[in-house]
Amino acid sequence: MKYDKSILIQKLIHHEGLVLQVYQDTLGIDTIGIGRNLEDRGITDEELEDMGIANIDHVYEFGITEADAILLAENDVEIVEDELLRAHPCVDRLDAVRQLILIDMAFNMGVPRLKKFKKMWAAIHDENFTVASKEMLDSRWASQVKSRSTKLAHAMYSGEMNG
């Protein structure tokens, strides 16, 4: 993959937020850091060890540091990237900006839901990024995330990431 992971993490912080205490997201799911779903994904023993935290109860009581949140997000991005490449190997051939956009979208909605954007994927395979960007906006996801979808669709169209 060509995209800069540190830029992606900054975009995810902007889009998802950075919360160092456990909170409930809009669906009532316990979440922490940069959108880490504690009910589906949790925090592995290895991640707790890497963060120097004894157990998950400590996370619920005291929260995590920004460095911990970034570590969790980097691990999540790695998983999302692997899932996305298995589902759509063509992502590896895209430029860095468009890779970043698709990883951002997959991070937000999950790869299974992103796979349902069939017209967008057909346009990406044809390198028709004008149509791909329009298909991004013609979705329930776009109505849910509003400005995020507009920014990402513009970047898909132009090949340039702004702001």
Question: What are the residue ranges of the model-derived segments?
Answer:
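Substrate-binding/active-site groove segments that recognize
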Residues: 26-54
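Alpha-helical segment that forms one wall of the substrate-binding/catalytic cleft
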Residues: 51-88, 96-103, 108-114
